[in-house]
Amino acid sequence: MFEPVAKNIFRWGTIDGESGIIMYSHLLLKEGKAVLIDPVAMPGLYKMIKVLGEPEAVIMTNHPHIRGSPLISSQLGILLYIPDIKEVEEDEAISNMFIDLYNMKHGIQYGGSTNLPFGIKAYKIPGRHEFALIFGDFMIVGDSAYGVNGKLNFYPSGIWPDETGSKSNATSDALIPIIKKTGAKGLLSGHNEDIPSGLQEML
């Protein structure tokens, strides 16, 4: 079920029944503990997690990446971190309804100054409703970037139509400065391929 990406980093995925797009989740390990990023629920998941490390927290990169996050955090009895509404959403009322509807009230809203598990740092992606997370040499994003045939792509390139390239250009303009600032060497994404190394050289 788990696919190794790099030392102390694994991923697993499942197909979205509506879009046909594969949704990927990541497990990060540090000192015998495990943090789950945008986890999708699957049979046998809890047992597999505990073989690798003691679950400590679930972190969502954006609110639409609900997947199994509220359920998994509740059933494992671990903390759930969700993006701070005021930092990533334009309509606070709708976002609060979203949180209520999907049972995320117990989630801790995080922002750029939050002390996340494993020393993970969060960076708001301008114009996008998500955070880029930094874990060691890796940047983690939900939707904004991913690999396609070994090359770096920016949302929605390679997933949804973008005939003029204006949308992917806007995403790259927002994310590239963060990649450069953090010096991230690899990319972990919620879709398509991860980029284990050479991220800076792809800019």
Language model segments and positions:
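Zn-dependent metallo-beta-lactamase
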Residues: 1-33, 181-182, 201-202
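Conserved beta-strand termini and adjacent loop/short-helix elements that scaffold enzyme active sites
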Residues: 12, 83, 109-113, 123-125, ...
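Metallo-beta-lactamase
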Residues: 16-18, 34-36, 42, 123-202
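Residues that act as N-cap/strand-start positions at coil-to-secondary-structure junctions
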Residues: 20-22, 108-110, 127
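Short hydrophobic/charged patches on amphipathic alpha-helices used for structural packing
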Residues: 25, 46-49, 176
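Active-site beta-strand termini and strand-to-loop segments that position acidic
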Residues: 28-31, 116, 133-136
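Active-site HxH/HxHxD metal-binding segment of metal-dependent hydrolases
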Residues: 41-114
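Conserved N-terminal boundary motif of the eukaryotic protein kinase catalytic domain
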Residues: 117-121
